[in-house]
Amino acid sequence: MAQKETGKQEILTQGQVKPPFTGPENDGSRPQADTPGPKQTEQANKWAVLVIVAIGVFMATLDSSIVNISLPAIASSFGVPLSGEIEWVIIAYLVVTAGVLLTAGRISDMIGRKPIWAAGLIIFTVGSAFCGFAPSLGLLIAARALQGLGGALIMAISPAMLTSAFPAHERGRALGLNAVVVALGVSTGPTLGGIITSTLSWRWIFFVNLPIGIIGLILTMRILKEKMRWNRGKFDPAGAILLALGLVAITLGLSFGQEWGWNSPLLIGCLATGVIALILLYIVEKRVADPIINLSLLHNRVFLSATLSLVLSFLALFAVSFMLPFYLEELRGFTTVQAGLLLTPLPLTIAVIAPFSGTLADRFGTRWLAAGGLTLACIGLI
């Protein structure tokens, strides 16, 4: 009888939904999805965590969309064209985020989520202040890279914080509400950025993050009780360096392909460096005890297909948001406020639908729901 119960428990453990950045097996510090606990404590903890995560995620997503709509004004302020250096205001953020994201998730597995989350809020808020006061385009780009570091820490562990706080049957709802926050940040950014840029200055699109970050940090320190620890395996510096090098090189190559020329030696060298680094990463990760990436996930067909679908859907739906502000303002003659309003419908629709999709996923599963959503997205693009 004991053996049967043990086998059942192992099946339940393997079937639990874990965050993408997993370290060793659950050592008891993360709540088991199927283990009941005191109801009052569960309710207080999970909703408090949701509020804290929502603040950080809203700040990070708001900043991404609010900067896009203000790029023409920033270029005009520093007297630079709309191509070339000004692109680094966006690319610096993306490059640092790409290089740090997975490493941040691994470190949080080792020392706990609270210190990484708090560090992310502090770095992002300080970076926002530096962006607002930047006297030159070069310093603005450097401050945006600092913001990217903070944003990577925030976005890397926000799903893990929610999946740890909520039981299995409520995770879809929690992640759906998190998607609402993401959509609200993206949808608020263009309109708010247009109003702020038109009435005040583009510098205030960064200052708006300061009160949000401070409030989030205060709540984090008062509500989250997790203490820093170092008991979940060793860090993999070689894997972290190769991962960062590979992702940064590929991101740079794809970002500047049109400007450098798709046949240029610089572009080919950049992409080749990225590919070689990722191949070496695969070789190294197979030989270390505590890899930065759990390669067994790549053999999980469900995880791999879901990840690829997510990447492709984001490319299809959100990649155009970078170019649309330039198209609407420079070619179509719309004001910054008008361009912001035209960019709002997509994320606003996501904000309305996401809570229902999360609940439906908890009840009926994700397979047909995701397929239906991607089908509707394809129809909309056509």
Role assignments for model-derived ranges:
Residues 1-20:
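N-terminal acidic, proline/glycine-rich, low-complexity intrinsically disordered segments
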Residues 15, 19-23, 27-222, 346-382:
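Transmembrane-helix bundle of Major Facilitator Superfamily
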Residues 38-46, 232-234, 260, 295-302:
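Helix-boundary and loop/linker segments of multi-pass membrane transporters
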Residues 49-58, 62, 67-69, 238-240, ...:
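12-transmembrane solute porter fold
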Residues 67, 91, 104, 142, ...:
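Hydrophobic/aromatic residues in alpha-helical transmembrane segments
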Residues 71-74, 158, 162, 196, ...:
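Hydrophobic alpha-helical interface/terminus motif in multipass membrane transporters
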Residues 198-210, 256-267, 335:
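A membrane-interface helix-boundary motif in multi-pass transporters
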Residues 210-229, 244-256, 273-288:
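C-terminal membrane-cytosol helix-exit motif in multi-pass small-molecule transporters
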